[in-house]
Amino acid sequence: MIKPHGGKLVNRIVEGAKREELIKKAGEMPRIMLNRDELTAVDNIATGLFSPLEGFLTSEDYNRVVEEMRLADGTVWSIPEVLGVTREEADNLKEGQDVGLYFEEDDELYAILHLEEKYTCDPEREAELVYGTTEEEHPGVKNVYKRDEILLGGKISLINRLKYDDFNNYRLTPAETREKIKEKGWQTVVGFQTRNPIHRAHEYLQKCALETVDGLFLSPLVGRTKASDIPADIRIKSYEVVLDKFYPRDRTMMVVFPAAMHYAGPREAIFHALCRKNYGCTHFIVGRDHAGVGDYYGTYDAQKIFDEFDPEEIGITPLKFEYSFYCKKCGGMASGKTCPHSADDHIFLSGTRVRKLLREGKKPPKEMTRPEVAEVLIQGMQQ
């Protein structure tokens, strides 16, 4: 089986006597309140989804990730995973200290941060290098600008897993997915990341990929997305419909990806691929404008970025697909690589156009969206 990124699967979950000891000591520690995105990141670090990270980046790691897409030791990592606090909060913390991490929604202790460093950064520099723009209209840049100014670096120890009340059948840790992949006997597995409901173009890409590997690992993102994106519960239902009716169940598995969208385009494509590698995938589908937003990135920038690295240091093989469509003359799904006909013969709808139709209670063309899926989406969008 493919090794996790960095060579081993990180596990920062503490149990038994060590856990009880940390809980007792936590009462004397300074406290920091985390929002849902921050606590989700803590959980993902602890379970190994973000391997090789063991905590939030120190300044040396942060600067190298921002500038070179590498950690301080040279390991490829493309998105800075950081924890920001106010200057007032930071003044009450000392480097070398343990800090209790609490969830703002229930005031419960979830983890301990072993604080190594307090530091500042230049948000505009981060925005320009990570997102390719300093415009606040970009949702990822907006989050960087509103983040508290002092960053805390250090390893974490997880006391309690983050509790979810949705999609629990599809919430598996990398250790659990790797065990399932072993049980299925899959030697090669292709991962597919999406924040959209399933449509025929994605189905076409997935099935093309499945022709060449043992298993398909569908991984819908269920963390924070833009308000205009279709809600996660509706998206998951759309996948359940097609998995039940149109996919070989013994060659597919669906595991939700519990992380927020950064909309970092090419850099996020690398990040998404590395996380699927940690789940046990050997291949990863990269389509048009992966993790993009608006017109900030070129159509295939997210594919080209993989060429900047030695394939061995990425470790997971990108499968690069052009955008696909229904061709009336071909009589089926195709792409620019396989179809000789003009755009006049192609049926393709943007996500914006599809969402508009669904909100109006209208079904998109059956060539682009299966009627069974359209019904689920219309019902969900009109609730």
Swiss-Prot record:
Q: GO biological process: what's one of them?
A: sulfate assimilation
Top-level taxon of origin: Bacteria
The UniProt GO MF terms for this protein read: ATP binding; sulfate adenylyltransferase (ATP) activity
Record carries keyword Cell membrane = no
- The enzyme class is transferase
Alphabetical keyword list: ATP-binding, Nucleotide-binding, Nucleotidyltransferase, Transferase
Pathway where it operates: Sulfur metabolism; hydrogen sulfide biosynthesis; sulfite from sulfate: step 1/3
Might you give the EC number(s) for this enzyme? 2.7.7.4
Q: What Pfam families does this protein map onto?
A: ATP-sulfurylase, PUA_2
- Reactions catalysed according to its record: sulfate + ATP + H(+) = adenosine 5'-phosphosulfate + diphosphate
Write down the NCBIfam families for this protein, in alphabetical order.
PRK04149.1, sopT
Indicate the family of this protein: Belongs to the sulfate adenylyltransferase family.
Q: What is this protein called?
A: Sulfate adenylyltransferase
Q: Which gene encodes it?
A: sat
